[in-house]
From Swiss-Prot:
InterPro entries found in the cross-reference section: LS, LS/RS, LS/RS_sf
Protein's name in the database: 6,7-dimethyl-8-ribityllumazine synthase
Binding site for 5-amino-6-(D-ribitylamino)uracil: 25, 59-61, 83-85, 116
RNA-binding keyword on record: no
Organism: Nitratidesulfovibrio vulgaris (strain ATCC 29579 / DSM 644 / CCUG 34227 / NCIMB 8303 / VKM B-1760 / Hildenborough) (Desulfovibrio vulgaris)
Pathway(s) of this molecule: Cofactor biosynthesis; riboflavin biosynthesis; riboflavin from 2-hydroxy-3-oxobutyl phosphate and 5-amino-6-(D-ribitylamino)uracil: step 1/2
Task performed by this protein: Catalyzes the formation of 6,7-dimethyl-8-ribityllumazine by condensation of 5-amino-6-(D-ribitylamino)uracil with 3,4-dihydroxy-2-butanone 4-phosphate. This is the penultimate step in the biosynthesis of riboflavin.
Domain of life of the native organism: Bacteria
C-alpha cells in the first residue's frame, strides 16, 4: 500500500496564546462556554497567563473585535463565543448570519485560526444543552478546533 503523507495537529497548547471574544448578551450561557474553552486549553498545556478574554456587547460586534485581535499579532488563535437565541422577529437571522460571515472573513483575511463557538438556537433550552449539559460544551469544542488548526497551520 502506498504511503500518503498526512498532516494532523497535535492537541498541545503549551506556549500558545489565545484570545477569547465573548458576548455579554446571554451571559449566563456564554460564561459556561468560556469556562469550557479555558478548561480545555489549560488541560492541554496552555498557561492561564496566555489566555485573554475580551467581553463585548453582542454577536454583531464579534467580527470587528476578532479581526482586530487576529491582526494584532499577539495571538496564535481566536475563539468566538456567544449565544443568539431565536425570538419572534427576524433579528435572529440578521445577527447570526452577519456574525457568522464576519467571523469567517476575519479568519480568512488574517490567516489566524478562529474557533467558532457562537450558538444559534431556537430556544434557551437548546442553548443550555450546548453550554455544558446534554450536547457537550461548544466552548470546549471551539477551543479544540482552534488548537488543532493552529498546530496544522504550523506544518503547512
Amino acid at each position: 500500500m502506498l504511503h500518503i503523507k498526512t498532516i494532523e495537529g497535535q492537541l498541545d497548547a503549551k506556549g500558545l496564546k489565545f484570545a477569547i471574544v465573548a458576548t455579554r448578551f446571554n451571559d449566563f450561557i456564554v460564561d459556561r462556554l468560556i469556562g469550557g474553552a479555558c478548561d480545555y486549553l489549560q488541560r492541554h498545556g496552555c498557561d492561564r497567563e496566555n489566555l485573554t478574554i475580551v467581553r463585548i456587547p453582542g454577536a454583531f460586534e464579534m467580527p470587528l473585535v476578532a479581526k482586530k485581535l487576529a491582526h494584532s499579532g499577539k495571538y496564535d488563535g481566536i475563539i468566538a463565543l456567544g449565544a443568539v437565541i431565536r425570538g419572534a422577529t427576524p433579528h435572529f437571522d440578521f445577527v447570526s448570519n452577519e456574525a457568522s460571515k464576519g467571523l469567517a472573513q476575519a479568519c480568512l483575511e488574517s490567516g489566524v485560526p478562529l474557533g467558532f463557538g457562537l450558538l444559534t438556537t431556537d430556544n434557551i433550552e437548546q442553548a443550555i444543552e450546548r453550554a455544558g449539559s446534554k450536547a457537550g460544551n461548544k466552548g470546549a469544542e471551539a477551543a479544540a478546533a482552534v488548537l488543532e488548526t493552529v498546530r496544522v497551520m504550523e506544518q503547512l
